[in-house]
Amino acid sequence: MSTRKKKADAEVAQAATVAASPDIDVEELEGIGRVTGAKLKEKGYYTVRDVAYASVKELAEIVGSEERAQQIVEAARKMLGLHSFISALEVYERRKKIRRISTGVRALDELLGGGIETRAVTEVVGEFGSGKTQLCHQLAVMVQLPEDRGGLGAKAIYIDTENTFRPERIMQIAKARGLDPDQALNNIFYARAYSADHQMVLVEQAKSLIRQHNVALLVVDSVIAHFRAEFPGRENLAERQQKLNKHIADLLRLADAYDVAVVVTNQVMAQPDVFFGNPLRPAGGNILAHGATYRLWLRKSKENIRIAKIFDSPYHPEGEVSFRITEEGLVD
């Protein structure tokens, strides 16, 4: 066997080992000593995976130079097998390992190809009262169910920006699904975000919770509220979008790095120049449009019936289904 082949096989074996143990300490990375390791951990980069998914610019502020940061990021990505091209077949094999959380609504699960995916950001858009927060509450319960019942046997993180989280609703849904209501609440890590900056800090802090606990769902309800309130007017639009872009990028990295399903809700805004068709469009512009992996639009129908439409997806066809909001949660 050639030296080159042996080296390649060794790299593959090392990447497989690290992939099976993603929480390997950052100080185990080649070229990282205790001092640099301590600096990285102080800023929230505890593992090789944390560093591999970080941006060079962020690390440069910690280690002192972009050149040094580039070396560290490349070493981490090489260790994880993220440093080169792979075949489309390997991508397919990896996607077969994607996990899904049932919404608890059979028709909606079918529309989504089995439920809410991990390693992706799913955006839920709709007017006030369309059922966005109700769906988030239900997902925070559903993720706790065992896999044979549509869940992942895991916990959830819930970042609330508009004070709409209700423990009482969680208890109702949990009881209807055969879970102990108090235990269901105990399996949800909750935080109220009071500003856009606070919201972004909470996402950073969520990484630590995910590492320490069996978390498979992160909810941000709503992702846009603070950004719209703090950056009003066209004169602040560029700054708002730049900040929102970083926030969405952080959520995408978190979803992929930790095999977590990220669900964000989004508000709608009117288009006064539209005279035909739907005059509403999602807030957040192209930043959210390009940042979310899957986009779901909820709207009211008669009484307690809601309509869910998938309107943007890499592979799902457009389609819509109806569901009902009851005391027991969302049902067909």
Swiss-Prot record:
Keyword DNA-binding: yes
Keywords recorded for this protein, A-Z: ATP-binding, DNA damage, DNA recombination, DNA-binding, Nucleotide-binding
Keyword NADP: no
Domain of life: Archaea
PROSITE patterns hit by this protein: RECA_2 (PS50162), RECA_3 (PS50163)
InterPro entries: AAA+_ATPase, DNA_recomb/repair_Rad51_C, DNA_recomb/repair_RadA, DNA_recomb/repair_RecA-like, DNA_repair_Rad51/TF_NusA_a-hlx, P-loop_NTPase, RecA_ATP-bd, RecA_monomer-monomer_interface
Gene3D superfamilies referenced in this protein's UniProt entry, alphabetically: 5' to 3' exonuclease, C-terminal subdomain (1.10.150.20), P-loop containing nucleotide triphosphate hydrolases (3.40.50.300)
Protein name (database record): DNA repair and recombination protein RadA
Similarity field: Belongs to the eukaryotic RecA-like protein family.
Any single GO BP term: DNA repair
Pfam families named among the record's database cross-references: HHH_5, Rad51
GO molecular function, one term: ATP hydrolysis activity
Database matches in NCBIfam families: PRK04301.1, recomb_radA
Physiological role: Involved in DNA repair and in homologous recombination. Binds and assemble on single-stranded DNA to form a nucleoprotein filament. Hydrolyzes ATP in a ssDNA-dependent manner and promotes DNA strand exchange between homologous DNA molecules.
Organism of origin: Pyrobaculum calidifontis (strain DSM 21063 / JCM 11548 / VA1)
Annotated binding of ATP, by residue: 126-133
